[in-house]
């Protein structure tokens, strides 16, 4: 049976992650309170950020920026702003 969590991003019970994907205390917080669906949404935003801002994960400042954006997105309800990006309309 799938593990469920109360997802802080979706504000509802949802299927939890299978294992801790991020190290440290932040990783534990993500594992305990972020759903698979919310994590997938973050991964899309992360990919856009890395590509559009040309982030280098070998650079500590870039990793710190990405981590802060992740916290803002998953826990503080702030959307990721990517200059020049216009979401598609349905």
From Swiss-Prot:
Pfam families from the UniProt entry: Iron_traffic
GO MF terms held by the record: iron ion binding
InterPro entries assigned: Fe_traffick_prot_YggX, Fe_traffick_prot_YggX_sf
Keywords recorded for this protein, A-Z: Iron
BP terms from Gene Ontology: cellular response to oxidative stress
SUPFAM superfamilies found in the cross-reference section: YggX-like (SSF111148)
A GO cellular component annotation in the UniProt record: cytosol
Family of this protein: Belongs to the Fe(2+)-trafficking protein family.
Annotated HAMAP family: Fe_traffic_YggX
Function of the protein: Could be a mediator in iron transactions between iron acquisition and iron-requiring processes, such as synthesis and/or repair of Fe-S clusters in biosynthetic enzymes.
Protein name: Probable Fe(2+)-trafficking protein
High-level lineage: Bacteria, Pseudomonadati, Pseudomonadota, Gammaproteobacteria, Pasteurellales
């Amino acid at each position: 049976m799938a593990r469920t969590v109360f997802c802080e991003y979706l504000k509802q019970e949802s299927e939890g992650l299978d294992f801790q994907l991020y190290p440290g205390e932040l990783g534990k917080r993500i594992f305990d309170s972020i759903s698979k669906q919310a994590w997938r949404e973050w991964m899309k935003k992360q990919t856009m950020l890395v590509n559009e801002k040309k982030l280098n994960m070998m650079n500590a400042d870039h990793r710190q920026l990405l981590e802060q954006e992740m916290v803002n997105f998953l826990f503080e309800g702030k959307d990721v702003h990517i200059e020049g990006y216009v979401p598609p309309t349905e």
